[in-house]
């Protein structure tokens, strides 16, 4: 189904993640993936979702067929992508044009050549025939009741080479009935001032409704998109998280946030901007790429503060070091705990974790010194909030949080004659007055330790059954001891509803891993509401 947007038609947010974004190296979308992303984008509230090129490959053809049946679009209209008719043919008889109509999409994007050299060398036809191809295809699709957008490929490079011909393609498309003519910086080499000047000139000379499609090869795709809007473009083409071929496309999320929060344009349905961070991360999950922590607006570090001076100011007024309220885009402010942290950082971090330090300057001072001491030894709490919370609670309560007492542990790796390895770990500990000895095998010494600790504790604490180790990172810290260098391990653990990170540091990677595992299980029990042992 195709939605009817609650917004007027004066400005378009057009997403091309499913076509252009899918060209990113490392992204391989199934039909199910494309359907899932389409649902997320519709939920976000974009006006148009370009689904792919029906007829060009079976996957895109299947996507359009299934999307019509399986998705009840609330906000977006589904768009089919294709090219103008072949040179010397008739649009009404062109198989590729027919496939666009057969897709059922009520909106169609046509890619057209606007660079004279591309017409002559790639299409191998004349400049006049290229204009006829544009006019014939647009007119035919409009006669079939379709809305038509025309992407002028390589427009800005073509404009520099032959401005009159590039403008004639725009004029031809518009006069044939194209609803929007999109100027594409296909090679991504333009800068904002250049984009703004060209868009303004083309708008004045042709009177066409213009859009912008910017690639990010100079790192300017978002800026170029906004520069085009400044010059009068009313249609922006973007991809979720900036996915796209080579280095990517204009990132949907910074563009939309800038339009809504900086330009004051309502380009999404009411309230949808607050879903932006969630949608960004959900789409990253579908394409199986880790969300960029430093992505504007939606990255976990977008509103993270580390320096003590910043924290002191934020304690007085968050706006002093933040350009917007993070909640406007569904994100949160985070205080990073490091050796740069001062008292204000610790107090704010405690508040974030739900620990009221009550203005206890002595306690806060102890925590500051403890953090600096630990980071000097190689620990990092910026990425290990759970370990920091355990440290903070230990200082506040005067003793570590204990659910179990470890007597000893060991991990053994055996090399076998056939070249295989056997990994076994044994843990001896006390929990609720009971001495427990547990042994387990794993696909590595750390996995064996994790399993043996789980075996030892699950009978006492069944809450641990739902914990999963989801990420494991090892870093050899700088030093002069070679194989004796200090090792830092970061472990991420999930209980199905949330995720937390813990850290361990030791000269031995297994010992560092054990520390992080102990913290992970301790925090998991704390998170589950289990009371610690007396």
From Swiss-Prot:
SUPFAM superfamilies: 2-isopropylmalate synthase LeuA, allosteric (dimerisation) domain, Aldolase
Protein name: (R)-citramalate synthase
Single GO term (MF): 2-isopropylmalate synthase activity
Record keywords: Amino-acid biosynthesis, Branched-chain amino acid biosynthesis, Isoleucine biosynthesis, Transferase
Record has Ribonucleoprotein as a keyword: no
Gene Ontology terms: biological process: isoleucine biosynthetic process; L-leucine biosynthetic process
Catalytic class of the enzyme: transferase
Organism listed in the record: Streptomyces coelicolor (strain ATCC BAA-471 / A3(2) / M145)
EC number(s) given by UniProt: 2.3.3.21
Gene name linked to the record: cimA
Similarity comment text for this entry: Belongs to the alpha-IPM synthase/homocitrate synthase family.
Catalytic activity from the UniProt record: pyruvate + acetyl-CoA + H2O = (3R)-citramalate + CoA + H(+)
Keyword Amino-acid biosynthesis recorded: yes
Pathway(s): Amino-acid biosynthesis; L-isoleucine biosynthesis; 2-oxobutanoate from pyruvate: step 1/3
Lineage start: Bacteria, Bacillati, Actinomycetota, Actinomycetes, Kitasatosporales
The organism's place on the tree of life at top rank: Bacteria
Domain annotation Pyruvate carboxyltransferase: ranges: 11-274
NCBIfam families named among the record's database cross-references: citramal_synth (TIGR00977)
